[in-house]
Amino acid sequence: YAKLNESFSFNYRKNKVNFFSTLGFNSRKNFQDLNIQRKFIESSTKEVKSNFEQLSRIRDDGKSHNAKLGMDYFASKKTTLGVVFSGFYNPGKFGNHSDVMIYDPAMSLLSQTLASTSNDRKWKGFSTNLNLRHVFDSTGRELTVDVDYLTYRSKNSQDLINAYYDAHGLPTIKADTLLGSLPQDINIYTAKMDYTHPLN
């Protein structure tokens, strides 16, 4: 599959104000095909008891959208104020379809299991940063302040289905179905202040 990774940056300064922004987009698809064969052997006679074969087709499709917008205000030669907004949105899908066949030693089909797994995910986040930097003098004395707010939201839907059949393609037992929903909500608040005072 083709992959795409693009970004755009912009910076503009006039007088005491500096604006900057970045936009990014990423698209990717991956695949994996597996063909697994096993023989089960009787330890005492070394004869083949049964044969196992698994065919799996795995597909993963994901995208990423990123954006950042910020501004610096140079209040004076010693003091700078800033604000930054950033966010991302990453949707994606994953699928795994497997056929599992069990054969006798003569390679006659005994049973078959069809397994299907799908995952639909959406992950997004947003952050805000307020910052201040003040230089007291030329000796290196400096004060910096940062206040941040970050939020993350995730929705993850999962489906797992296993169906069981005999050698004639007739269901042997009821299919297993497992449905999952895994949401996440995260909020983070931080603040810090640093003061630098050189000793010499």
Label the predicted regions.
Residues T172-N200:
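Outer-membrane beta-barrel transmembrane domain signature of Gram-negative proteins
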Residues Q32-V48, F94-L109, N156-D166, L170-T172:
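Outer-membrane beta-barrel translocator domains and adjoining extracellular loop/strand segments
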Residues Y1-H97, T117-Y152, Y189, D194-N200:
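Membrane-proximal, glycine/serine-rich, low-complexity loop/turn segments characteristic
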Residues A75, L109-S111:
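Generic signature of intrinsically disordered, low-complexity, basic-rich segments
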Residues F52-R57, S111-S118, K174-S181:
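Extracellular loop and loop/strand-boundary signature of outer-membrane beta-barrel proteins
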